Amino acid sequence: MAFPEPKPRAPELPQKRMKTLDCSQGAVRAVRFNVDGNYCLTCGSDKTLKLWNPLRGTLLRTYSGHGYEVLDAAGSFDNSHLCSGGGDKTVVLWDVATGQVVRKFRGHAGKVNTVQFNEEATVILSGSIDSSVRCWDCRSRKPEPVQTLDEARDGISSVKVSDHEILAGSVDGRVRRYDLRMGQVSSDYVGSPITCTCFSRDGQCTLISSLDSTLRLLDKDTGELLGEYVGHKNQQYKLDCCLSERDTHVVSCSEDGKVFFWDLVEGALALALPVGSNVVQSLAYHPTEPCLLTAMGGSIQYWREETYEAEGGAG
């Protein structure tokens, strides 16, 4: 007799708080996982960038060199370098191991809201309130960007990179997708100022959050609206959104102190996770596991699924 095929495990959502870390760097403007999810970065209003092991709750290194608050950061694919951007209008390339500044890229006319490496970590992309996305060659000694994308009519709030494509969300209410191979740009008009954009992990869709307290899932190639997700509050702050590690759920920060999870296909609210009484400023989802980082005030919170048991106890 043949045994029935085991059903695929239903996705679990991270709702067990494992750790709260006081980052001691003023307000945490952004929290980001590194490429494999073992470490995380926090961006502080005190001009510092910090590298942590979030499960152990240990601070590994502090990076100092910005002249104003740090607003975003990212790690390279090989964990050797970091990039960051901030209120001082600069983009900084860091050596992870030494903590030293490798390069400072200047040229933006306003604060840098968002930074990303390309997949090879040879180029840093930065988006600024000056309405431009700039591409900086990490290996060149030239101070100018190798490319400037200036189609936006208002500040850039979010930049994401996938293979040969750049996704840029703007306060002008448009998401622009640049195909670098074809030299083409396509634009989807949402209307409300955009706070965050991201690609789905399968690369087929884009997720967009905006200041009308709505998230929208679009077909990447056609711009067709595939889903809308509401219930959270996002009316005045630049808040993060993302998809869960298996593209099963849409996840968003909220101004009412919660993180909201919706079923991607059904659009139904799956969980409103209470974090605290203030705005959930930033979040990051683990690349392969049901694990979430949130930032509120001066601390970050580390969340796992209910069934998770840390090695050696939860600490």
From Swiss-Prot:
Superkingdom of the organism of origin: Eukaryota
GO cellular component: catalytic step 2 spliceosome; cytoplasm; lysosome; nucleus
InterPro entries noted in UniProt: G-protein_beta_WD-40_rep, WD40/YVTN_repeat-like_dom_sf, WD40_repeat_CS, WD40_repeat_dom_sf, WD40_rpt, WD_repeat_MORG1
Record key words, sorted: Cytoplasm, Lysosome, mRNA processing, mRNA splicing, Nucleus, Repeat, Spliceosome, WD repeat
Disruption phenotype: Morg1 deletion causes embryonic lethality. Embryos show defective turning into the final fetal position and widespread apoptosis in many structures. They also display severe placental abnormalities and delayed neural tube closure.
Entry comment describing in which tissues the protein is expressed: Ubiquitous.
PROSITE patterns in the cross-refs: WD_REPEATS_1, WD_REPEATS_2, WD_REPEATS_REGION
WD repeat ranges, renumbered to this chain: 23-62, 65-104, 107-146, 151-188, 190-228, 231-272, 275-313
UniProt subcellular location: Cytoplasm; Lysosome; Nucleus
GO biological process: inflammatory response to wounding; mRNA splicing, via spliceosome; neural tube closure; placenta blood vessel development; regulation of canonical NF-kappaB signal transduction; response to hypoxia; response to lipopolysaccharide; response to wounding
SMART domains in alphabetical order: WD40
Assembly: Interacts with EGLN3/PHD3. Interacts with ERK signaling proteins MAP2K1/MEK1, MAP2K2/MEK2, LAMTOR3, ARAF/Raf-1, MAPK1/ERK2 and MAPK3/ERK1. Identified in the spliceosome C complex. Interacts with PARD6B and CRB3. Interacts strongly with GTP-bound RRAGA but not with inactive GDP-bound. Interacts with p62/SQSTM1.
Family designation: Belongs to the WD repeat MORG1 family.
Protein name, entry field: WD repeat domain-containing protein 83
Species per Swiss-Prot/TrEMBL record: Mus musculus (Mouse)
Taxonomic path: Eukaryota, Metazoa, Chordata, Craniata, Vertebrata
